[in-house]
Amino acid sequence: MSKPLVSHIDKEAQKDEFRNILKPIYSNLKGCDRYIRLAILTGVSRFSRLSIFSDLNNLDDISMDSEFAAICGINEEEMLRDCRPGIQRLADYNEFSYDEAVARLKNNYDGYHFARHCPDIYNPFSLLSALRKREIGDYWFATGTPTFLLKSILHKGVNLEHYLNSRKANITSLSSIESYSSNIVPMMFQTGYLTIKGFDRENGYFKLGIPNREVERGLFRGLMPLLADISGDDAGDFIIDSARMLREGNADGFLTGLQTLLAGVSYELTGTKSEIFFENNLYVIFTMLGFDVQTEYHTSDGRIDVLIRTPKYVYIIELKRDSSPEAALAQINSKHYESPFRADSRAIVKIGVNFSTATRNLTAWLIES
């Protein structure tokens, strides 16, 4: 079902047209006060400057009120109390323990917070779908993802990992959408891509992040076709092949595949910030693989561009733009980027990569084990 305002938030003329249609619908409610004892109006967003509710000015907005923070969704106490038979069926069907089933449900569907004081909230649609089908799957994103929002994220030209996991916002900015083009964080919060992860009492702002693995996978699955010329079965094959090669220590094979993937990317997406674009590609791909990946990982003597940890290998990747892989590898060694991982039982693989702004692709790399 199309959402008249949210679906057209990037189209000012249509947004105003729909606003004018919706306004009298809500205005009629105020004239029905004597017939209505209690009414709850729900939706994704409040458009404060659109004046849809200007005539209906006696509403009490409880969107971020801690007293009502758990009014929607299912908290963990409720799930463990009321869904135990379904959780056990899920565990039995997939041949893992009850506790592991709970952990997987939590990892995939928990993590929403809608106010400063709020218990962990599970996505009810996804949780109940998983219990009914006895399968940990991605159910919420089957309902669709707004492409304009994904494109807006990419065109910010920012490091995706930090943008999606280290956002800060005050309650005023999160409460309503003024213009998606100037700040898309409120839209991402209100549509469920970001949620409250903490509160800075001294400075009065919320810390935001991705709620859970289902949202993360769905978001990145939507971003991947925009980052590279790949989708559908080809994307699945690439992810499977990449996972296998990195688990086996075949960094050269992975980088060759990535080079082929990036060859089809248009200049419109990469623009002038090619290095950030490449880092974002790696971050999205490795997150979809399920690996522990961090970009701009800080050490005592510098910053690792990309750090990937698989069960058997720790990959340290340094990116250079219009330089050489030798220079990139020399930086890894001179700054001793491997030092924090020397006690790790996994093999350390250092990779120096050169990225060309002319071709918008990686041109050469050196690997040192």
Positions of PLM-derived features:
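Metal-dependent nuclease catalytic cores in nucleic-acid-processing enzymes
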Residues: 25-32, 186-194, 283-287, 291, ...
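Mg2+/Mn2+-dependent nuclease catalytic core
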Residues: 15-20, 321-338
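Switch/connector loops and helix/strand junctions flanking conserved nucleotide-binding motifs
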Residues: 4-6, 48-54, 325-328, 358-364
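Phosphate-binding site recognition
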Residues: 1-274
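Active-site metal-binding core of divalent-cation-utilizing nuclease and nuclease-like domains
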Residues: 285-311
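Acidic-basic catalytic patches of nuclease active cores, encompassing PD-(D/E)XK
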Residues: 260-294
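Domain-level recognition of nuclease-like catalytic cores that cleave nucleotide substrates
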Residues: 340, 344-369
